[in-house]
Curated annotation (Swiss-Prot):
InterPro entries xref list: PHBA_efflux_AaeB/fusaric-R, PHBA_efflux_pump_AaeB
GO cellular component entries: plasma membrane
Identification of the protein by name: p-hydroxybenzoic acid efflux pump subunit AaeB
Protein's gene: aaeB
Family stated for the protein in its record: Belongs to the aromatic acid exporter ArAE (TC 2.A.85) family.
Length: 655
């Protein structure tokens, strides 16, 4: 496919984007809004953002969800701006500096919350800055300006949502149905690999792919939940399927590890059963029936605990899978499965990374303020706004540098494109609403094609071009003002890029160490006799951390294996029949306190000291288990955990 070719699958969204832009433009001028540009820009960003992230037409619900986040972020930003202006209107410089800190604070929060919700916080940061900068000449108009901005942004979002609904939004349900079936087959094939106990790299690749596919299915569930309330029952089932899928991965990998020391535990009967190849979910269903008959015949005690648990989880998966595909009423049996254990929320391991993002955004905004005041350039304020926009949006993504480059390319492309519209197209079409709408529809259509291809600079070009062409009421054509706006965008993006390069983010290794220590803490916390604590479901949180580790350190198999081993240890200890007495309960609390100290230690020396203390306490704990005559189902997992911590002590304590 050539660089300028148009694929059939890209046309529908391009038309949808063009329709959103035209609708926002028409409504803006029809209701005599002062700056219809904001409504048009909002419609374009809300519609095109999910498409750029997805690399194609976004699923139904994604545009609506992004629109809701933009409304929330705008209102938070407006309230913050009004508060800052009311309290500091007599000190303009201090007011702007506080806005810079607010933008950094919002970026810090957006780095810690869920990725899908971080957009609202990033937006609220630079919205406050835009309002404070814009009303410098007339601060008494702040309430009116804030209301106008909120109104026009809401209009733009409504137009984007209407365009999405008008062109039959793409449902994610069929993809969910296919993936639910495919995931079950892949789970069975992973267990086949683990039973064979073949090449470890092949097994690592298989479980790594399954972790990613399970995370992707959870993302699809979020999209399905946003799509329509009628998928509520399917959404409940998919939540439970996420935990069941992670349980299947854990049991399969533990089966592989068990055979390193006790290959005789997997009998020939089960080896023969798993030699049969499977291609479809129906094949897996047949094999599970055979497996349940074998377990009933051999008895639970003669069946390896990992295979017994795996068969139970796979059976529940099959039960819920049928309900997801048919979206039928939840049966009594399904309700028992869905009334599972409370899911523990994950604690962010990226606090240092979030603090780096805070300083990047704050320093870049302060630098923009100093540049504006020093030069007195009329578009210094525009440059400052672009600095805030780029840093606020770039910091929450995995590669901020490439986001900044995308904005630079986009603003550079917007200069000639905006020049064409400013000098030729808009002056000749402003007398006709039809021609004006058609001209912007053409812009939206072709840039919509490029956005879906994730062309570098396409998203920045769309937003920057709309931002600098004259879409105000009334239209005024001042070339110097246009040129200042275009150059201000370019300078602002370049300054943001420079700050991102200068303020280095060295938090990757620290984040990796914190993640590994959180796995250790989770495994240690599983050693408890507290009934409520033992019922907590840590699997989604642990695998979410593992997924983050895989993204931070792609290809680092030793780290992945260590993390997976800790997850397996957590699950095994959670189900272990630990003797119930006050002596062990008190020591469990001591172990958890020491593990927490390891995570929160401020330097390597303290961390090594607390980690050494944890290892000593584990040795004491093993002795206590022998005194209290704990069964092998308890002592063996604790011994394996202690051995792993001794083996990887340096990886878990050194930066």
């Amino acid at each position: 496919m050539g660089i300028f070719s148009i694929a059939n699958q890209h046309i529908r969204f391009a038309v949808k984007l063009a329709c959103a832009i035209v609708l926002a433009l028409f409504v803006g001028f029809h209701f005599q809004l002062e700056t219809p540009r904001w409504a048009v820009l909002t419609a374009a960003i809300v519609a095109a953002g999910p498409a750029f992230a997805a690399g194609g037409e976004p699923y139904s619900g994604a545009i609506r969800y992004r629109g809701m986040l933009r409304i929330i972020g705008t209102f938070i930003g407006c309230i913050a701006a009004l508060t800052i202006i009311i309290t500091m209107i007599r000190a303009p410089l201090l007011m702007i500096l506080v806005c810079c800190i607010w933008a950094g604070f919002c970026t810090w929060i957006s780095s810690l919350v869920r990725v899908e919700n971080s957009y609202a916080w990033g937006l609220s940061g630079y919205t406050a800055l835009i309002i404070v900068i814009t009303i410098q000449a007339e601060p008494l108009l702040t309430p009116q300006f804030a209301v106008e901005r909120c109104s026009e942004i809401v209009i733009g979002i409504v137009c984007a949502i209407m365009a999405d609904l008008l062109f039959s939004p793409r449902s994610v349900k069929q993809e969910v149905d296919r993936e639910v079936d495919g995931l079950l087959v892949a789970q069975y094939q992973l267990m086949q690999l683990c039973i064979k106990h073949g090449d470890s790299e092949e097994v690592d690749k298989a479980w790594g792919d399954l972790v990613r596919r399970t995370a992707a299915l959870e993302g699809m569930r979020s999209n399905l939940n946003m799509e329509s309330s009628r998928w509520g029952r399917a959404n409940r089932r998919l939540k439970a399927l996420n935990t069941l899928s992670l349980t299947l991965i854990t049991q399969s990998c533990e089966t592989y590890l068990i055979q390193n020391t006790h290959p005789e535990l997997i009998t020939d009967t089960f080896r023969e059963l798993f030699e049969t190849p499977v291609e479809t979910a129906q094949d897996v269903h047949k094999q599970l029936k055979r497996m349940r008959r074998i377990i009933a015949w051999t008895g639970e005690r003669e069946t390896p605990v990992t295979l017994y648990t795996w068969a139970g989880a796979a059976t529940r998966y099959l039960l819920l899978k049928r309900g997801v595909i048919g979206n039928a009423k939840i049966s009594v049996t399904e309700e028992e499965v869905l009334q599972g254990e409370p899911v523990v929320k994950v604690e962010s391991a990226e606090r240092h990374h979030a603090m780096v993002n805070f300083w990047r955004t704050t320093l870049s905004c302060v630098l923009g303020t100093l540049f504006w005041l020093w030069t007195g350039w009329t578009s210094g304020s525009g440059a400052m706004v672009m600095i805030a926009v780029v840093t606020s949006l770039a910091m929450r993504l995995p590669n901020p540098r490439m986001v900044a480059i995308d904005f630079i390319y986009g603003t550079l492309a917007a200069l000639p494109l905006g020049l064409l519209y400013f000098l030729v197209i808009i002056p000749n079409t402003q007398q006709s609403m039809l021609l004006l709408c058609l001209s912007l529809a053409v812009l939206g259509f072709f840039l919509g094609i490029e956005v879906q291809k994730r062309r570098l600079g396409s998203m920045g070009a769309l937003a920057s071009t709309i931002n600098i062409i004259v879409l105000d009421n009334p239209m005024t054509f001042h070339f110097s003002q246009f040129l200042d706006s275009a150059l201000g965008q370019i300078v602002g993006c370049m300054m943001a890029f420079i700050v991102i390069l200068l303020v280095r983010d060295n938090s990757r290794d620290r984040t990796g160490r914190v993640l590994l220590n959180q796995f250790v803490s989770a495994a240690v916390s599983a050693m408890t006799t507290n009934v409520v604590r033992r019922k907590e479901n840590h699997l989604p949180a642990l695998y979410q951390q593992l997924f983050l580790l895989m993204n931070k350190f792609p290809g680092d198999l030793p780290k992945f294996r260590l993390a997976l081993t800790m997850i397996i240890a957590h699950q095994r200890l959670r189900d272990a029949p630990i003797p119930v007495n006050h002596d062990l309960s008190a020591f469990h609390r001591q172990l958890r306190r020491t593990a927490d100290h390891v995570i929160s230690a401020g330097n390597d020396d303290k961390r090594r000291r607390y980690f050494g203390q944890l290892l000593d306490e584990l040795d004491v704990y093993q002795e206590k288990l022998r005194v209290w005559e704990a069964p092998p189902r308890v002592t063996e997992p604790v011994k394996r955990l202690s051995g792993m911590l001794h083996k990887y002590q340096h990886a878990l304590t050194d930066n």
